[in-house]
């Protein structure tokens, strides 16, 4: 595929996806935009968020100041945009990032399969997975996932191009959006363990920016490992929302809840009406094509290492005390979705059964996104 043809195709992917995202949710509510307030604080040379609305969850008070527990990269991405265009919303940036992610998925997957399959799987990613709702809604938790995906996908593209230092650097940037992603380093280590030169370059890149989080924590709370997440966790204990038990912040007893939500959580059926469950929905119902990437056995080498990387990230996510709160789908899937997409690309064939599963996935996500908008999620 020539450069100009690739450029035109990438532009068409970007334009098509961002148009769909904008059309399906033209008037978003634009609340829970924590990162926008944090970005404004960064531009003012401060780390606290004094102007954060009082009803916004996931914040904490420390020494008379209000802070957010989240890693800083999503706010750093927003900061220059807000500096140029003061009134830009987090959701407006989110749909742009979502469309960029679709382009990056295409560029990544065509390294593992034919262009036609890569294009079909790009449509699947953008419109048939939780990436659809995540990009469209753009609230704080989803914005972190969307931003992390940019860097995670860039890391995998750089890895495939043998740019190992950049690959490690991008993985750390992704981790400074969503901390569990750093466990994806398992994949890279297994892939490069017999190539010491490449592995060393990757490790140097991966570790170079890790101190950013430690310094950020120390400047806010006086300890390099103090993120504020534990305080937020304690604020949720005993809340009336969840029908599930309140176990520990990272607790092995949380694994069944996450596993069920990820795979099997069904929709709600009441008075003959089928609606998405606010607790999430399993990929069995809304993203069935992805099941192909989860069927063992995994071929020795790349497939097995991709699954190992997915498992390492998923394990930390599955230990978390909450399954993702109010959501369509299972948002934590986005932390390890790039690995599963590559496995899917390796196995995917443009046959009727695969196309049918793709169409079902896209239709289910259009249904779910429309309901989520209607329900005010």
Language model features: what each stretch is:
Residues 1-377:
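Membrane-proximal envelope and lipid/glycan-remodeling enzymes
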